[in-house]
């Protein structure tokens, strides 16, 4: 039985200086990585970092993990993707409940909203615990 080729991802910290992103993205792509991922932080948006990588590495996917949906809703994420001219077909967006009071209810509502507002974007859900894992599994 043959196994599918292993995918390789490269992770960076959001907020890297612009002059670092282009050369690093090209090197990551040339090294055979399939995607570049950035974290998201209140003081450095992962999508903005990925936009710096997008032009220099046009053959690999771009991912951000994890955007706390209690800080940024689907409208803000969609606006950022449009403003930054990111191709939805290249994007992976990791999302989590953040510090919401009822995380299961919160994520149940937000996932359908995200799917509606972010067509073509691949979503992954941060899930800790059996109930959130079950929700993540039923959402995909």
Put a short name on every predicted segment:
Residues 20, 45, 72-73, 103:
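Secondary-structure boundary/capping motif
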Residues 25, 63-65, 137:
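Glycine-centered structural positions embedded in regular secondary structure
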Residues 13-17, 41, 67-69, 96-100, ...:
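Active-site beta-loop-alpha junctions enriched in small/polar residues
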Residues 2-8, 73-140:
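Internal, glycine-rich beta/alpha segment that forms the wall or movable "lid"
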Residues 37, 61-65, 92-94:
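Short, conserved beta-strand segments within well-ordered enzyme catalytic domains
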Residues 60-76:
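Short hydrophobic interaction/assembly module
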Residues 1-61, 121:
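N-terminal beta1-alpha1-beta2 module of alpha/beta enzyme domains
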Residues 45-50, 69, 76-80:
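Alpha-helical scaffolding within the catalytic cores
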């Amino acid at each position: 039985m043959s196994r599918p080729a292993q995918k390789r991802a490269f992770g960076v910290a959001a907020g890297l200086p612009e002059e670092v992103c282009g050369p690093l993205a090209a090197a990551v792509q040339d090294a055979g990585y399939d995607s570049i991922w950035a974290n998201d932080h209140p003081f450095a948006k992962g999508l903005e970092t990925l936009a710096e990588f997008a032009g220099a590495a046009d053959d690999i996917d771009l991912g951000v993990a994890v955007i706390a949906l209690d800080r940024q809703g689907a409208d803000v994420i969609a606006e950022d993707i449009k403003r930054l001219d990111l191709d939805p077909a290249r994007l992976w967006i990791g999302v989590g409940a953040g510090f919401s009071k009822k995380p299961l209810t919160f994520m149940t509502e937000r996932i359908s909203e995200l799917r509606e507002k972010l067509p073509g974007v691949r979503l992954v859900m941060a899930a800790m615990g059996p109930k959130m894992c079950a929700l993540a599994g039923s959402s995909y």
